Every structure is written in structure tokens, then in C-alpha cells.
Amino acid sequence: MNTTHIPEPHRTEQHTENLQHWRKILDIAPIVSIVFPAIMYFIFTKDSFEDSLFLRFITLLLPFSYSAVQYAVLLHTNWKSHNKPEGILHTTLYYTLNLLFLAFSIISILSITTLPINKWKNDGGPILFSIFLPPLFMSPTYLLSTSCCLVPGQIGFTDTGINILIDILTLLCSVRSLLLILEESEYCYCFAAISSILILIRLLREKHGPSEKSALPTVPWRVSILVLILIFAALIYLFMMWVSIDILSDHFDLLTKARSTPVSEPGQ
């Protein structure tokens, strides 16, 4: 029986090329995931979003797909890491991170399927889902994937220089934006816009001139920043899960009511 033997160096080179290809895609994905929904908002009218399930789905597809894929990549990288944790504390943190990444990825997929069901009937619906949501949940996603080291034993915030200020401002704007949206304040959109601009600045800086990373990510203040990012990410995805469950609940209540409504016979 003939077998094809692929030399090990060739496999290694092919694997490296595949990784580089994925990195290029993930590098531009955050920009596209923020800009594309915004473009859709300015092109189409409120009635267009209300009438078209497909349009709502396409608007949300890229940002939530990026979130799902990015957390799946973080989970895979963390799980396959050769640096296994030692001690109860590091082991607990290691498995907690993996569970969080898995949950964030699943919630992102759930959001893709549930959020378009809502018809975005109120005036703030289209701008909420196309302008506000993408930068809100993408800021912790991008910070965790770019500005943090998640290798067991080296877990911490790694950015240096001006990027530290940009990252902290991005996080603070996103936190404030979430609080304002829970209060149903119109000012949440201002902070969402600022957060989007900061993320785009951070992306362009990383693309054209990658900054140095700290060799000591485990110092207390750097670990504290990572913990804050994780807490905010958990709050964001709990919020998204609550929104998805609420939409599904309303949808199935409407279906139940429609099925229970008696159909009048002709002539009655």
C-alpha cells in the first residue's frame, strides 16, 4: 500500500503559515467588526432593520463571530500550553480562565442567533445594536487577546508606554457606557463612540508599530488590571446572556399566545 510521507519540517512550516494567516485575519477583524455595523446603521433606515431579519443578522454577524472565534482561540491556546500550572492557586486560576473563555464564546454564538429575533422596533434599537454593542463587548475581548499574557505562571497585563493609558481609558469608557445603558441614558452612546475611537487607535498603533511587552507581567498592579478586565468581560457577557434570554422568553411567549388563540370559523 502506497503511503505519502510528509517531512516533519514541511508540516512545521505549513503550521506556521496557517498561524500567520489566522493572525492576519484576527488583526483586521476588530476594525471590521466595529466599522461594518456602523456603516450598516448609516446606510439603512430604522424600518429596514425592523422589517428584515437577514439585515439584523448580517449587522451582528461579524462582531459576535469575532468574539466567539477570539475566545475559542484563547481557550485553545491556553489549554494546549506546555506551561502547566503548579499549586492550587495557579491551577484554580487556569481552569477558571478556560471556563470563562468557553462561556464567552458560547454566549457570543447564542447572541448571533437570538439578537436578530428582536425586531429593534424602538427608535434606539438600530443604534444600540449596531453602534453601541460592538465596542462594548469587543474592548475586553481585544484587551485580553492583545494586552495580556495568559500563560500559566506568567498571567498578567503586558502593555507598556502610552498603550497602558489607551487601554485603561478604553476599559473605563466601556464600563461607564455599560452603566449608562443600564440606566437607559442617552449619554451611553457618547462613551461608546469614545471607546470605539480608542480601540481603533490601539489597533492602528499595534498594526504599524507594535509596542514592547513587559517582561514582568506578574507584578501585582499588572495582575490587578488583568483581573479588572476579566471582571468587566464577565459583566458584559452576563448582560448579553440576560438580553438573549429575555428575547427568547418574549419570543416563545408570543408563540405560545399565538397557538392558544382560538381561530374563528367563517361566519361566526
Curated annotation (Swiss-Prot):
Domain of life per record: Eukaryota
Pfam family name, one: DUF2463
Membership in a protein family: Belongs to the UPF0328 family.
Protein name: UPF0328 protein ECU10_1850
Source organism of the structure: Encephalitozoon cuniculi (strain GB-M1) (Microsporidian parasite)
